[in-house]
Amino acid sequence: MLRIFCFVISWCLIAFAQPDLSGFVSILGAACGYGFFWYSLEPLKKPSLPLRTLFVSCFFWIFTIEGIHFSWMLSDQYIGKLIYLVWLTLITILSVLFSGFSCLLVAIVRQKRTAFLWSLPGVWVAIEMLRFYGIFSGMSFDYLGWPMTASAYGRQFGGFLGWAGQSFAVIAVNMSFYCLLLKKPHAKMLWVLTLLLPYTFGAIHYEYLKHAFQQDKRALRVAVVQPAHPPIRPKLKSPIVVWEQLLQLVSPIQQPIDLLIFPEVVVPFGKHRQVYPYESCAHLLSSFAPLPEGKAFLSNSDCATALSQHFQCPVIIGLERWVKKENVLYWYNSAEVISHKGISVGYDKRILVPGGEYIPGGKFGSLICRQLFPKYALGCKRLPGRRSGVVQVRGLPRIGITICYEETFGYRLQSYKRQGAELLVNLTNDGWYPESRLPKVHFLHGMLRNQEFGMPCVRACQTGVTAAVDSLGRILKILPYDTRETKAPSGVLETSLPLFNYKTLYGYCGDYPMILIAFCAVSYLGGGFLGYRLLAKKEIR
């Protein structure tokens, strides 16, 4: 009966240990949820389950939980029914990894190899790195330590060891709690210590920084546009209609501002393609700035330059970029920083979305897609960018730009800190998964970079979370976003963003300390098991 209770209570705790669902359940689940589950697999009193039954039970438990955690993927209005197969594949892979780890833990407990037990947090980090670095472009959502970030102190701990340190801590805490349930000596003290230590480090650092924050008076006045356009729009009567809607949004902006930001691919036709009739643009932009003479048609660059001249500040805008090489047309998802003189500095997205921006498996994957799923085959070759994401604009701090879910990969953004970035700007569009949890899930994963690197961030989104967040992870201003109950309205976020920056261990070292810990843990466990087997063979002889 106790095993069933632990199984059920652990499922409830971990299934809803999501910061977007419940902060309290997230913290509680991170403290004891997995410990209850492992106790249900291997309790103090026997009988023990056969290994196969153990794996199946574990797989069922985590498979149903991962299904809830990634339920936002099942919004198929724009993505299509193939997303169900992608969802099933993803949660199956994640479930197999966790089930294998749990069976390893139980096997060590059964053999009473306590010395090996404490290598397991590092082993889990090594396993989780497979998903961060190895599953397609990397799966950064819903890592095991994410529930810790429901607390400001838990998020601040990420400034020391990043996402991997948070996952390490959650595994260590729950193993200690499991040992407490097994009535192991010193387990209670160990559980309290592993539970409080990460939050204590985070709390001390956070409270110290709050005091230092007050001494820095620098701020940036930003205006962030949320057009709230759906991903697939009805056929336009005229190309200029998109700019007409955007200009209606920006015209009430209170001046002066230092930076005007638009979301990912906010207008079609790329940067330089001249598709907008001059007369139509002159009618719309006459109250903003003079337009270049001698052109029959204007481009997105011309329109953005006019806005930059009007507001006397740079404009960051998400655009497509097309490049023809050897008779092959390549597509880049880009961000352009355009000054009032028309000078542009660009960045191309580096981490592409599997399926949406590239087909995994190279030529073989593309062939299979064309044969079995022709509807989802991509019309042109899409490439990851190589241009630096850190841009320097006169009169502004260095800006680190990310597009879409790039902001959720801490190790990718470490180079931004080294290059002197003081502000993160993310351009995104979560509208591909309407009426789902994705906007908030994406936002909460992205804002972790603030405290990992000690930088504020601004997010510009079509229908997701458009927000300004300071370097301590405090939300300064946020626009309404798309949920199951409400549609995101169009609007402009205007705020003064404090530029307080600080150095962090994670910003300096990145994932390398945890990679070293993971390597040592795997080596110790592997070497220990090998030595144990060799010793057993000698005894048999």
Swiss-Prot record:
Membrane topology note: Multi-pass membrane protein
GO molecular-function term, one example from the UniProt record: N-acyltransferase activity
Protein's UniProt keywords contain Nucleotide-binding: no
Bilayer-spanning residue ranges: 21-41, 54-74, 82-102, 116-136, 157-177, 189-209, 512-532
Pathway in which this enzyme or protein is active: Protein modification; lipoprotein biosynthesis (N-acyl transfer)
An example Gene Ontology CC term for this record: plasma membrane
Compartments it resides in: Cell inner membrane
Keywords noted in UniProt: Acyltransferase, Cell inner membrane, Cell membrane, Membrane, Transferase, Transmembrane, Transmembrane helix
BP-aspect Gene Ontology terms: lipoprotein biosynthetic process
Keyword Cell membrane on entry: yes
InterPro entries: Apolipo_AcylTrfase, C-N_Hydrolase, C-N_Hydrolase_sf, LNT_N
Active site: 264, 349, 404
CN hydrolase domain segment(s): 220-499
Domain of life: Bacteria
Role noted for this protein: Catalyzes the phospholipid dependent N-acylation of the N-terminal cysteine of apolipoprotein, the last step in lipoprotein maturation.
Cited HAMAP family: Lnt
Similarity comment text for this entry: Belongs to the CN hydrolase family. Apolipoprotein N-acyltransferase subfamily.
Protein name: Apolipoprotein N-acyltransferase
Organism: Chlamydia pneumoniae
